[in-house]
UniProtKB/Swiss-Prot annotation:
Seems to act as a chloride ion channel. Plays a role in retina development. Keywords: Chloride, Chloride channel, Endoplasmic reticulum, Golgi apparatus, Ion channel, Ion transport, Membrane, Nucleus, Signal, Transmembrane, Transmembrane helix, Transport. Pfam families: MCLC. PANTHER family: CHLORIDE CHANNEL CLIC-LIKE PROTEIN 1. Belongs to the chloride channel MCLC family. The chain crosses the membrane at residues 198-218, 235-255, 347-367. This is Chloride channel CLIC-like protein 1. Residues 1-16 form the signal peptide. Its main location: endoplasmic reticulum. One of its GO terms (cellular component) is endoplasmic reticulum.
Length: 508
């Protein structure tokens, strides 16, 4: 009995379950102060490494079984040491890979938290000025980016997979984007106006006018077009532009008046309702007694009538010509008023009347001199011959039927009778000015027979001729210087010249 108890007491400490209550004082890295126990990660890591090594060994064993067996047969001690070194190297590589994987997972989790905070900050800053929604699906913001040397180093170390600090990188990203605001497309125009003191459109129009003047002078167009023609065209162009300008101004004014009338009118609902005969009679009596327009009529008139119809072109044209005359006079009168106010403010009242008379005389003299200086070149220009006045006048008036001739229809005197003074006999034919070689001569006709007295001959076209009056005969007679045959004896006969004796006159 005593022997049995001794054996039981001896075996009781040996039997029992293994627990993790034991604390290794030499391994403080794996000690968990919160739980007061040792961590199990090293054992898990060793187990994983053991299994990984075992797997690699099994793979090597399956890949090269024959080679391993031969090496074990030849040198068993060397084979064991070589395998140990190989397994040890693989174990170290696996430990390094495991640590690298853990470090990457840890850094990945930290970087995700950093970027979540960074994106959250962007949304908060953009939400202060408005985020996109259904009515405004796209938003354009402006922000400033700020960098320092420390921020740049942290960001570069993070991108290069180096050692980086979570807090430093978070502060760097949080301080990068500042001053969120909406993008303004016309901000550059304001900066331009602040820098140069002029609007962009005004500067563009000024440059365009300067370029037009340079082109006008450089291409010598002004030498071919007169100044009065250019001034006339400029006035016409200004009138056309002013017409469109004034029409747009009147349209805007009419539109503003219409909107003001619509804003003043109230109780629109009663205009769409039907009224009884008593209400209609009451409204008619009210309008007849007070001479006020019907508010519903004013409402529908303002609602239906377009402002475009309220501004006809004649109204814009009348305003254009009115402004063309009155606007310069307004500015001239304003300038004269300011001049007289400044001039007469320091002059006593007694001397103001002579000063005004003197100024009036000076103005009259100035306008007279200016008018004379302007009209003298105009009159000189009118006296000068221009391109349209250089056409030479004809030497003699031309006739439409130059090549048509008229035969002499007068009857020659009978034998033994002298011709009368008003008769012209055997006058040589007058050759036309343009007929030098005689190509336009009419056909020769036989002299008139005395028996044909009283007959009227015709020209080559067969049309009857009319006898010319005495004045034309007289002028022809004087121009020929009495070239008549000698008729002293009664028996003298008219001599036939070398040319035909038939009298031919140019038709009128």
């Amino acid at each position: 009995m005593r022997l049995f108890l001794l054996v039981a007491l001896y075996l009781s400490p040996v039997y029992g379950d293994y627990t993790d209550e034991w604390i290794d004082p030499s391994d403080m890295l794996n000690y968990d102060a919160a739980s007061g126990k040792m961590k199990n990660k090293p054992q898990v890591e060793s187990t994983q490494s053991y299994y990984s090594v075992e797997n690699t060994v099994s793979q090597d064993a399956t890949q090269q079984p024959a080679q391993k067996a031969n090496e074990l047969h030849q040198n068993p001690d060397m084979t064991c040491s070589a395998e140990y070194q190989e397994y040890k190297t693989k174990l170290e590589n696996l430990k390094g890979q495991l640590e690298e994987t853990k470090r990457m997972e840890k850094s990945k989790s930290k970087s995700q938290a950093i970027f979540k905070r960074y994106l959250n900050k962007i949304l908060i800053e953009a939400g202060r000025i408005g985020l996109p929604d259904e009515s405004y699906p796209k938003a354009h913001y402006d922000a400033e980016v700020v960098f320092t040397m420390e921020m740049l180093q942290e960001i570069q170390s993070f991108l290069n997979n180096g050692d980086w600090n979570v807090g430093a990188l978070d502060d760097a990203l949080s301080s990068t984007l500042v001053q969120f605001k909406h993008h303004n497309e016309e901000e550059w125009k304001w900066k331009f106006e602040d820098s140069f003191g002029v609007d962009v459109y005004t500067l563009f129009m000024l440059i365009l006018c300067v370029l037009c003047l340079v082109k006008l002078i450089a291409t010598e167009i002004w030498t071919h077009i007169g100044w009065f023609t250019q001034l006339k065209r400029l006035l016409i162009l200004s009138t056309v532009i002013s017409f469109g300008w004034n029409w747009m101004y009147l349209y805007k004014v009419a539109f503003a008046e219409r909107q003001a009338e619509l804003a003043k009118l109230q109780d629109f609902d009663k205009c769409s309702q039907k009224i009884s005969w008593s209400e209609s009679l009451f409204d008619w009596m009210k309008g007849a007694a007070t001479f006020q327009n019907d508010p519903c009529e004013d409402y529908f008139k303002a609602l239906i009538v377009s402002p475009t119809l309220m501004v006809p072109p004649t109204k814009a044209l009348a305003l254009t010509f009115t402004n063309f005359i009155t606007e310069p006079l307004k500015h001239i009168g304003k300038g004269i008023g300011e001049f007289l106010n400044a001039l007469l403010s320091e002059i006593p009242l007694f001397f103001q009347v002579p000063v005004l008379i003197f100024i009036a005389v000076l103005l009259l003299a100035f306008f007279y001199g200016a008018g004379t200086a302007v009209m003298n070149p105009v009159n000189l220009y009118r006296r000068l011959t221009g391109p349209e006045r250089e056409k030479p006048l004809p030497v003699e008036p031309t006739r439409s039927n130059r090549k048509r001739f008229i035969e002499d229809v007068r009857v020659p005197p009978a034998l033994g009778q002298l011709p009368r003074d008003n008769d012209v006999v055997n006058i040589p034919k007058q050759q036309p000015l343009d007929d030098i070689d005689g190509s336009n001569n009419p056909p020769v006709t036989a002299p008139a027979d005395p028996s044909d007295t009283g007959q009227v001959k015709s020209n080559n076209t067969g049309e009857p001729l009319v006898q010319e009056d005495h004045s034309i005969k007289k002028s022809i007679k004087e121009s020929r210087n009495d070239e008549r045959p000698n008729t002293e004896s009664p028996e003298a006969k008219p001599q036939r010249p070398e040319e035909p004796v038939v009298e031919t006159l140019r038709s009128t």
